Amino acid sequence: MGFVKSMLALSLGLSAMGVMPAPACTRVMYKGLDSIVLTARSMDWKENIGTDLWIFPRGMRRNGEAGEHSLEWRSKYGSVIASAYNIATADGMNEKGLVANLLWLAESEFPVRDRMRPGLSISLWAQYVLDNFATVSEAVEALAQEPFALVSSYIPNMPDKFATLHLSLSDPTGDNAIFEYIGGRLVIHHDPSYRVMTNSPVFEQQLALNAYWSEIGGTTMLPGTNRAADRFVRASFYTQAIPVTDDVQLATAAIFSVIRNCSVPLGISTPGQPNISSTIWRVVANQRDRVYFFESVLSPNVFWVDLRDVDFSSDAPVCRLKLTGGQIYAGNAAADFEVSEPFVFEGV
């Protein structure tokens, strides 16, 4: 019993590090049989972030939106993404099955901008990866060279706060990588076993916390609060506990159940803990079959976009699936996208 109490104290101590105004997202990856790989995430935020889904074709010209000497590139791969405020890419999957998830990390400290490197606004961080890489290994090799200076900007409706985020990547082989800026330095965690990410504390400390709870065993006791460290432990346990199957329908249902278990009820508020934010949507990306599932907490059903039904050719238009008006979709919504001008990424 003394051991359990000590582990609980450690969990509460590390969880308390995350008490600050921030969203409480969770990301998990599942690897099943017959090459099934699924990545799920929740988006938790204190208000509606005006998310729409977008189709971006190959060949789009991009600008890093970081002022003078911004990074420029042309997209190599097409992608389906979920926007935030229609000024940033928060989540998405490209046509090669590479998935990018942006989550909050209050401990992020970005370096003073190096003017020798082209700048990249944080609103484009995930999109840059989706545009340019097919695998996690490719992205890790390229980003480790720090080809750009990442520049943060203010959050809509929070004019006194900069965006502090970390980035997770996964691909159809089951590989994973986490990118964080800690103390002004880029830290990359790259290993297929890194299947779970939440918010605070930094990823290295999350791994240590999870190792302690693994000694207890999830069938004995699991931390049950909405804090990031507790959600990390629960997501890790349940991702390992659900069936390893070759039935993609069962696997999808199972990983949805895990991400729902880590979600925060709509409308909940915790006095003194503004970081405990309600879950507003959830995503599951089937990377083997290139299917992007989306679930709004305000919608009666899950719908999906089958990327195999999307035209990503360089002469195809940008298309948008409007969600901000409370629209309801069912089944494969690939045909419901409408041609649209692309949104403008937030710059600095």
Region spans (language model):
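Short, surface-exposed beta-strand-loop junctions and turns on beta-sheet-rich folds
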Residues: 45-47, 106-108, 184-186, 298-302
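A short, polar/proline- and glycine-enriched secondary-structure boundary/capping micro-motif
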Residues: 48-53, 110-114, 188-192, 303-309
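Bacterial N-terminal signal peptides
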Residues: 7-18
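A contiguous strand-loop segment
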Residues: 23-117, 150, 330, 336
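Positively charged n-region of N-terminal signal peptides that target proteins for export
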Residues: 1-6
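C-terminus-biased signal that marks the final domain/tail of proteins
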Residues: 23-38, 62, 151-153, 157, ...
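Proteins synthesized as precursors that undergo proteolytic processing into mature forms
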Residues: 119-152, 248-257
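Acidic/His-rich structured neighborhood in mature extracellular/periplasmic domains
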Residues: 96-123, 143-202
